[in-house]
From Swiss-Prot:
It holds the Pfam family Na_H_antiport_1. It catalyses: Na(+)(in) + 2 H(+)(out) = Na(+)(out) + 2 H(+)(in). It comes from the Bacteria. Na(+)/H(+) antiporter that extrudes sodium in exchange for external protons. It is a multi-pass membrane protein. Keywords: Antiport, Cell inner membrane, Cell membrane, Ion transport, Membrane, Sodium, Sodium transport, Transmembrane, Transmembrane helix, Transport. GO terms for molecular function: sodium:proton antiporter activity. It is found in: Cell inner membrane. This is Na(+)/H(+) antiporter NhaA. The gene is nhaA.
Amino acid sequence: MEKAIRNFLSQESAGGILLLVAVALAMLMANSPLSGLYQGFLGTDVQVKIGELDIHKPLILWINDGLMAVFFLLIGLEVKRELLEGALSSVAQASLPTFAAIGGMLVPAGVYLLFNYGDPVTQAGWAIPAATDIAFALGIMALLGSRVPVSLKVFLLALAIIDDLGVIVIIALFYSTDLSTISLVIASLAIAGLVGLNRKGVTSLLPYGILGLILWVAVLKSGVHATLAGVIIAFCIPLRAKDGSSPSEGLEHSLHPWSTFFILPVFAFANAGVYVGNMNLETLISPVPVGIALGLMLGKPIGVMVFSYIAVKLKLAQLPDGVGWKQIAPVAAMCGIGFTMSMFIASLAFEHADPMYGDLARLGTLIGSIMAALVGYFWLSKVLPNKGV
């Protein structure tokens, strides 16, 4: 278990650096003479036509709907493993990160709505600061090396996974529109097929892949966000085969490098390019970026700490071994690193609104996430013992 966590964290730390490079490159291109090339590249029409099936979208939507579905497949595999065998497999292990994650979603959403109350357009972005970017958060923590107790790393990992699960539910309930009955019926049949494969003990990934592709297309056409197909597929792939092998973990290990070093950097590059040349102080202090930035910088740590404290005081949860509140507090600050997950929700929340709102949301996400990363890193560095960095 500990070896798996260490391998996960080492990969996430490298991935976090690559994400930063992708974000910096996107911002550089969006605010330079290369801006036209950048926007033109993301707007490139890509069409897939097979018989009556016709999917025609700009490249950025293929990234957000297609590549991110694979990312959510990986999240689903991680969540299933942790629920059945890992850090969330018992009530005692799952209680504290669960309460922390709930607080870390509710309070930032409340902060955002406080600044955007009464505006039906901007209110749609309430879930943006509720997300935590697991790659960035774990990557920042990994920079502190062996000074960080494994139990603290497991706490952040479990919290982030529950947060991801919450984001999945939010997307399903609040960001699905114009539902197509026929597509939903096809999706339901595909899900029934996937469940049937699981019940029959099929361990070959090929039939899951075929039905999964059908499910993705059906969900894409249904009005429900296509990334949810990845989660459903993940939950249907068996964790253990009769011979003791794990099809689920095998796929997870295969997908993880692709997600860390390709999918998330590509997503960050495609979505982080905010043109700031036409922005001024009035823009920066408008409700959307302020609500998101403060939701991430203040709402996240306050929500995580308050809900955790209440849970421990009511004896509904307990602190990890060898970890006190002075270590939990900076980790709570790190949970405000929203980056790719917050940007993804922003792309859904303002998909049909003026593009300006998307730019403002990304700007708020960048400011809030960077501040949360800096505060979390230096705070945690200060409270940890100075040994073997």
